A protein has these predicted regions:
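A fold-wide structural signal in alpha/beta-hydrolase
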Residues: 61, 90-94
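Short beta-strand element of the alpha/beta-hydrolase
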Residues: 59-69
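A glycine/proline-hinged amphipathic helix-loop "lid/cap" segment
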Residues: 1-56, 204, 292-310
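Alpha/beta-hydrolase active-site loop signature
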Residues: 69, 98-105, 167, 263
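Proline/glycine-enriched tight loop/beta-turn segments at coil->beta junctions
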Residues: 53-61, 221-223
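Catalytic nucleophile-loop/oxyanion-hole region of alpha/beta-hydrolase
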Residues: 74-75, 81, 94-129, 270-276
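Gly/Ala-rich beta-loop-alpha elbow adjacent to hydrolase catalytic centers
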Residues: 134, 138, 142
């Protein structure tokens, strides 16, 4: 793995912009997935990718928010993963190139996700056709966008899919969990540096002290059905587990899949890992199920609520 050493270096100079530029530019060399097309669209304050597998219909659509610690990642880094979801779920995908720290606050990224949701509604998609999804920091954004919709009097989506999600910006529990030492992708030092940088950005942009609000601390009642996937060797395993418990307590239909031996956002390695391809198929099945439910009906449970997967 080369990601963990690179993040370890970044932890010592977290305000540097090189990481975002290098990662996104390097990802431009990744070949497109066969049978999938994409085109650039413009949202209010950022761009997005409109991704469609050649077999995709207009029955369902995924609003996708990429990971990258709110600092890096983008349309290039996550195009193949978003394309696989489109292909597997027979769905279109709107992948949002949301604004990043340190120039922008996390709240700006949430606003960009909301703009993506409005874009879909404006083009005639029913909320019962829309699933909001994200990985890592994008998982945080997926929940925060969904929570914001009710405050804006916007209809809730059909479902949420969170892959290796960050759901608690407080790093304390994660750093104390055994998974922090086992994770081959995220070093503890990077998590500590990200927390400190987030606090500085919040103070500079909003004039407030402390971290932004976390999904695990929210009133989750009324959220649509949720699928959580995480690897057993993922630094963010505790976040996925805690979010599962919070959603269960709130009465939200939720399924948690823990993939044994897998690392942070292992889905991006679908070209090499059969487990990643299986996980994406589970995501696709969830999308198909929740988007076929009619308005006012209860969604069937497509997966066991909590299970380990070898």
């Amino acid at each position: 793995m080369t990601v963990k050493p690179a993040l370890g270096v970044w932890a010592h100079i977290p305000s540097a912009r090189w990481a975002a530029r290098v990662v996104d530019q390097a990802a431009r060399v990744l070949p497109p997935l066969d049978g999938v097309g994409h085109r650039r669209v413009r949202l209010t304050d950022c761009d997005a990718d409109w991704i469609q597998a050649h077999n995709a219909d207009l029955h369902s659509v995924v609003l996708y928010l990429h990971g990258g610690g709110f600092l890096t990642g983008g349309l290039n880094t996550h195009r193949r993963l978003a394309s696989r979801i489109s292909q597997s779920a027979d769905a279109s995908v709107l992948s949002v190139n949301y604004r990043l720290m340190p120039t922008h606050a996390i709240g700006d990224a949430v606003a960009d996700g909301i703009a993506g949701y409005r874009w879909l509604l404006a083009r005639g998609f029913s909320p019962t056709q829309i699933v909001i999804s994200g990985d890592s920091a994008g998982g945080y954004l997926a929940f925060m966008v969904a929570l914001a919709l009710a405050d804006l009097d916007l209809p809730r989506p059909a479902g949420l899919v969170a892959l290796s999600p960050l759901t608690d910006l407080d790093p304390t529990v994660k750093l104390q969990h055994p998974a922090s030492a086992r994770c081959p992708i995220l070093p503890s030092s990077a998590l500590v540096a990200l927390t400190a940088l987030t606090e500085r950005v919040e103070h500079r942009t909003r004039g407030v002290s402390g971290l932004p609000f976390s999904p695990v601390n929210a009133d989750l009642r009324g959220l649509p059905p949720v699928l959580l996937q995480v690897g057993s060797r993922d630094m963010l395993y505790p976040d996925a587990r805690l979010m599962f418990e919070c959603l269960t307590d709130a009465g939200v239909p939720v399924a948690l899949e823990v993939w044994d031996g897998q690392f942070h956002v292992f889905h991006v390695a679908a070209d090499l890992l059969p487990e990643a391809r299986r996980a994406i198929e589970h995501v696709a099945e969830f999308i198909r199920v929740v988007t076929t439910v009619q308005n006012g009906d209860s969604a069937p449970d497509p997966l066991d609520s909590d299970r380990e997967i070898a």
